[in-house]
Amino acid sequence: VVAILGSSGSGKSTFLRSLIDLETVDGGSIAIAGENLCKDGVYVSKKEKAKALSKAGMVFQHFNLFPHMSIRKNLMCAPLLNKQGTKEEISKLAESTLAKVGLLDKIDAMPSTLSGGQKQRVAIARALMRNPEIILFDEPTSALDPELTGEVLSVMSDLAKEGITMLIVTHEIGFAAQVADKIMFMDKGYVIDYGTPEDVIINPKNERIKTFLEKVK
């Protein structure tokens, strides 16, 4: 688990979006689970790109659920399009995946009936449906009321315990210190520190990071 920290506008979300082709890069190389997305600033073919992107799941800040579909259909939509199995198999997968985030009783509900925390847990389940090698989280709790944040962080903590690889952009410093194996700190578009939570945020040596942590306490 890698947590990406930094002030607003430091490039965290842009970096994350670049990894799944939602932003275009003009230099460098990106590979997901050994599959190239771009090399030396040149993107691979459409087919190779699809193969690389199939290795990653994404959880956005604002849930992005289809409002006119039930939770079951929201989870089944992409797997059906990608022919991951029969309709019955994918429906059962939706049930087991939703149970993992504690929302099996909401499987036939509509998104409008769910709280923000529940919607984000559904979004996490949707990302898990693809059985990805890595899940990217773009500030998954920033759109939630403080009292709803805990339920989402709890699900993410459980995923970390299962050994699921995650790259998390977050402002939840305490959560990052507890769950992350590594912390990446960004400032003005650059990575200015990378290491264990102990080295980067518990006993920081970088003055910029010290200033940041003092302001968010």
Predicted regions and their residues:
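Helix-to-loop junction immediately C-terminal to a conserved catalytic motif
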Residues: 20
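A short, proline-enriched helix->beta-strand linker immediately N-terminal to the Walker B motif
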Residues: 129-133
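Short coil-to-helix segment of the ABC ATPase nucleotide-binding domain corresponding to the Q-loop/switch region
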Residues: 69-77
